[in-house]
Every structure is written in C-alpha cells, then in structure tokens.
C-alpha cells in the first residue's frame, strides 16, 4: 500500500511539474491569418489570398538559425505590404495599404501607419512603407515588436532609381531606398512614442 501511495504521489508531482512547461511552450495566441496580396502584372484585377500561421512566440526564439515558421510568416508580411490591386488606378490610391492593415489587425498589431507613397502616384525614387507595432512578452519582460513592410509588388514603377549606380562608393539607388525606409521607421517610432 505504501508503494502505491508513493507511486501516485510521484505521478502527481510529475504531472504538476509538466503544467508550467506546457503553459510556457504555448502562448495561446496562435492563429491562422488570411493575407491578401497582389500578384501578376496587369494579368488580373483582383487580390489573391493565402493563409499563414502567426504567434507572438515566433519572436521569442532565436532568429539566427533558419526557422520555417518564421520564414513563412515573413513571406506573409512581404505579401501584405504589396499594394492592393484596387489601388492600381489613380482614383483609388486610398486602398493601397489595405492588405497590410488587414494582416496587422489579424495579428494583434496597433498603431498601423503607412508613408505617403502608399497613397499617391509613385516617383522614380519613392518607396511605399508600412509599419505596425504591438507589445509581446518573453521571459517575464515586455517588448515592443515593430512590423515593417516595404512594398515589393504592384508598386507603380516606384524605386526605379534602384538601378542607379554611383561612380564610387555604395549603390546609390539602393541607398536612397534604404534611407527612406530607415527614416520612416525612425519617424514612426517617434510618432508612436515607442522607447
């Protein structure tokens, strides 16, 4: 009888000890996100849809080693940053960032903003940029996660200057796009009061 009681107590201790590990392993926020995106150049007039799995836990593990889950959600972010097919026409630029907004909201992000180039005709050195932020928790601490989506399709011939090289030094056209993205991120952080 004594052995049974000890065995039951050991089983109970083992089961109870697994509860914190199970709770820590799953943040409980895993969700399927429907991402709409523009595909093709003039071949169609609608956005496509793909699903991705999002969880804040994607950002509590190291990004220094390849992780399929993070790669897939990163692709979803890149897709969402494309301008919606609805914005192809000059009278409909206001919908340019709607796919990014939808994805960010589904993932629980707030402070969703886009630069002016998401809403007006492109220029040779313009680049559309979207940002959103949210607070995530890891190891008992709170951190601000900022999603930055740079438009990579259905961009109305923007960033054409990317092919411009300089006689010496860095790739001038690429540097112009890089600087716009970093400047917009800095202004987003300041505007939203993120520290």
Locate predicted features.
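A conserved cap/lid and substrate-binding interface adjacent to the catalytic center
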Residues: 99-194
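Hydrophobic core
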Residues: 10-18
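Short stretches within intrinsically disordered, low-complexity N-terminal or propeptide regions
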Residues: 23-24, 80, 106, 134
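Charged, compositionally biased non-catalytic regions
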Residues: 32-109
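Sec-dependent signal peptide cleavage junction
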Residues: 18-29
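Positively charged n-region of N-terminal signal peptides that target proteins for export
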Residues: 1-5, 9
């Amino acid at each position: 009888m004594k052995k049974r009681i000890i065995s039951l107590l050991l089983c109970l201790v083992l089961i109870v000890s697994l509860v914190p590990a199970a709770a820590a392993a799953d943040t409980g926020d895993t969700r399927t996100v429907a991402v709409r995106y523009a595909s093709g150049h003039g071949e169609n007039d609608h956005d496509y849809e793909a699903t991705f799995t999002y969880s804040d836990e994607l950002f509590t593990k190291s990004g220094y080693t390849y992780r399929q889950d993070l790669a897939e959600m990163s692709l979803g972010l890149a897709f969402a940053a494309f301008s919606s097919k609805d914005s192809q026409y000059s009278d409909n630029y206001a919908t340019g960032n709607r796919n990014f907004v939808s994805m960010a909201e589904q993932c629980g992000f707030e402070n969703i903003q886009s630069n002016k180039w998401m809403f007006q005709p492109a220029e040779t050195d313009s680049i559309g940029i979207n940002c959103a932020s949210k607070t995530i928790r890891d190891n008992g601490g709170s951190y601000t996660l900022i999603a930055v989506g740079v438009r990579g399709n259905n961009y109305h011939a923007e960033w054409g200057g990317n092919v411009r090289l300089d006689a010496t030094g860095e790739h001038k056209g690429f540097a112009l796009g890089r600087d716009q993205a970093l400047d917009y991120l800095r202004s987003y952080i300041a505007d939203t009061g993120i520290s």
